[in-house]
Amino acid sequence: MLDKEKKAEIINKFKLHDTDTGSPEVQIALLTERINNLNAHLQVHKKDHHSRRGLLKMVGQRRALLNYLMKTDMERYRAIIEKLDLRK
């Protein structure tokens, strides 16, 4: 789970303007951080299937946001992929 400071840091890094908290970039960055944390948890707790289901749901949500961003603005999509290092 993200604490307030970490969440604020991520929002500040990816926001488009001063009061931005809900742009696709911010949402994708927050989901990516939560996914990475949950992934580390599942490496240790392999049989935690409830958390695995939540992880899959978050990955699907991030995928939908990325698809939306790709359809609306390809340049912003490429920038967020590059910043978060999502593609290998």
UniProtKB/Swiss-Prot annotation:
Domain of life: Bacteria
SMART domains: Ribosomal_S15
GO CC annotations on file: cytosolic small ribosomal subunit
Listed PROSITE patterns: RIBOSOMAL_S15
CDD domains, per the entry: Ribosomal_S15p_S13e (cd00353)
One matching Pfam family: Ribosomal_S15
Record GO biological process: translation
Molecular function via GO: rRNA binding; structural constituent of ribosome
Cited InterPro entries: Ribosomal_uS15, Ribosomal_uS15_bac-type, uS15_NS1_RNA-bd_sf
Keywords for this protein: Ribonucleoprotein, Ribosomal protein, RNA-binding, rRNA-binding
Gene3D superfamilies given in the database record: 6.10.250.3130, S15/NS1, RNA-binding
SUPFAM superfamilies named in the record: S15/NS1 RNA-binding domain
Function: One of the primary rRNA binding proteins, it binds directly to 16S rRNA where it helps nucleate assembly of the platform of the 30S subunit by binding and bridging several RNA helices of the 16S rRNA.
Family, per entry: Belongs to the universal ribosomal protein uS15 family.
Stored HAMAP family: Ribosomal_uS15_B
Subunit structure: Part of the 30S ribosomal subunit. Forms a bridge to the 50S subunit in the 70S ribosome, contacting the 23S rRNA.
Name of the molecule in the record: Small ribosomal subunit protein uS15
Species of the source: Thermoanaerobacter pseudethanolicus (strain ATCC 33223 / 39E)
